[in-house]
Amino acid sequence: MTVIAVIDYDMGNLHSACKGLENAGAQTVVSDRPEDLFAADAVVLPGVGAFDPAMQHLRSRQLVPVIHDLIASGKPFLGICLGLQILFEHSEEGQEPGLGILAGTVKRFDPEPGLTIPHMGWNQLDLTQPGLPLWQQLELRPWLYFVHSYYVEPADLEVQAATITHGSQTVTAAIARNNLVAVQFHPEKSADAGLQILANFVSQIKAPVLV
């Protein structure tokens, strides 16, 4: 059975992410031990909360270089919600530097009349990399579940894999580059479409992406 390591760094309840991956046919191991992360077939970086505490927790566990090495090794890697945002260089939300694996920043939604911030609830993805294996067997504009006040703004739009529109603002909702994929929505809370995405990720592990 495919083993997926879920990085434990005290940022959110990991149970729902693990349950979603297990429903997709994987075995999960929750750990912050580098040996467990490298031994797994793939790694998931989840996260709920604020940018600065997330980075502080990763640094306190000496996990920043480990995450860099995991991604550089070609191991399939999925970031979810805050796990997408901290892949970038910095955030308007705080002062801590991010992982810097992707160039760009994390920005807050601009206020608009009638616009709810945080963006909380269901929204439709527009797939900017429609051929991405992560999107297989999805509807053309699938509905996914979001809870966020901030969004990523990649310096290189070629990594953008999907967008959403909230009010008048169209922003990046997913990125993909080689073995690295990350999403702003919560697939584990997104009903059938979310479970399909997790199943697609598990399937990719069995057919690795060449870097």
UniProtKB/Swiss-Prot annotation:
Its EC number is 4.3.2.10, 3.5.1.2. It comes from the Bacteria. The keyword Amino-acid biosynthesis applies. Keywords: Amino-acid biosynthesis, Cytoplasm, Glutamine amidotransferase, Histidine biosynthesis, Hydrolase, Lyase. One of its GO terms (biological process) is L-histidine biosynthetic process. InterPro entries: Class_I_gatase-like (IPR029062), GATASE (IPR017926), Imidazole-glycPsynth_HisH (IPR010139). The active site is at C81 (nucleophile), H186, E188. One of its GO terms (cellular component) is cytoplasm. It catalyses: 5-[(5-phospho-1-deoxy-D-ribulos-1-ylimino)methylamino]-1-(5-phospho-beta-D-ribosyl)imidazole-4-carboxamide + L-glutamine = D-erythro-1-(imidazol-4-yl)glycerol 3-phosphate + 5-amino-1-(5-phospho-beta-D-ribosyl)imidazole-4-carboxamide + L-glutamate + H(+); L-glutamine + H2O = L-glutamate + NH4(+). Pfam families: GATase. Pathway: Amino-acid biosynthesis; L-histidine biosynthesis; L-histidine from 5-phospho-alpha-D-ribose 1-diphosphate: step 5/9. One of its GO terms (molecular function) is imidazoleglycerol-phosphate synthase activity. It is found in: Cytoplasm. Residues 3-211 form the Glutamine amidotransferase type-1 domain. Heterodimer of HisH and HisF. IGPS catalyzes the conversion of PRFAR and glutamine to IGP, AICAR and glutamate. The HisH subunit catalyzes the hydrolysis of glutamine to glutamate and ammonia as part of the synthesis of IGP and AICAR. The resulting ammonia molecule is channeled to the active site of HisF. This is Imidazole glycerol phosphate synthase subunit HisH. It comes from Cyanothece sp. (strain PCC 7425 / ATCC 29141). The lineage of its organism: Bacteria, Bacillati, Cyanobacteriota, Cyanophyceae, Gomontiellales.
